[in-house]
Amino acid sequence: MSSNLHPVGGTGTGAAAPESVLNIVEEIAASGSVTAGLQAITSSPGMVNLLIGWAKTKFIQPIRESKLFQSRACQITLLVLGILLVVAGLACMFIFHSQLGANAFWLIIPAAIGLIKLLVTSLCFDEACTSEKLMVFQKWAGVLEDQLDDGILNNSNKIFGHVKTEGNTSRATTPVLNDGRGTPVLSPLVSKIARV
């Protein structure tokens, strides 16, 4: 029914992905710091791909192979719900445009839609997690976490949205690299986007 090769997880044996996930959970529990463990997991695309591969073999493939999911009615319903979600999110952005500056709670709308889109493409469309997608995910998850922890966008994140710089911790809005002489240089990703 399922293959031993995980296209997203990148492991060659069927039992390696669940054992690796269990080892990660045990290491986090042994370290006593859930925050440090989650930061370690969310900072590596390889680890995220491993977790996505495990989730695909345990949850996504059985759902895809079910008769209900393969029915035309279910597929049309999911397509309509997805379109309604995107349209509702965009409509809320335009309707509450003036509120975005006054009330940061409305920033949850694009963050939630972006997270859903990234999860759907990674889990259902057989796309691997790249460093760029992981950085975008961390930014959006950072906005959600920052808004939901105390209701204020004040960079009080404990898990998502922080990168270590020379002496402080800041939100990873635009990745800036150092050229060794103290002059900030844009990352290759931002440079590539700027050229387009």
From Swiss-Prot:
It comes from the Bacteria. It is a multi-pass membrane protein. The keyword Coiled coil does not apply. It is found in: Membrane. Keywords: Membrane, Transmembrane, Transmembrane helix. It holds the Pfam family CRPA. InterPro entries: CRPA. Its main location: membrane. GO terms for cellular component: outer membrane. The chain crosses the membrane at residues 34-54, 76-96, 105-125. The keyword Ribonucleoprotein does not apply. Disulfide bonds: none annotated. This is Sulfur-rich protein. It comes from Chlamydia pneumoniae.
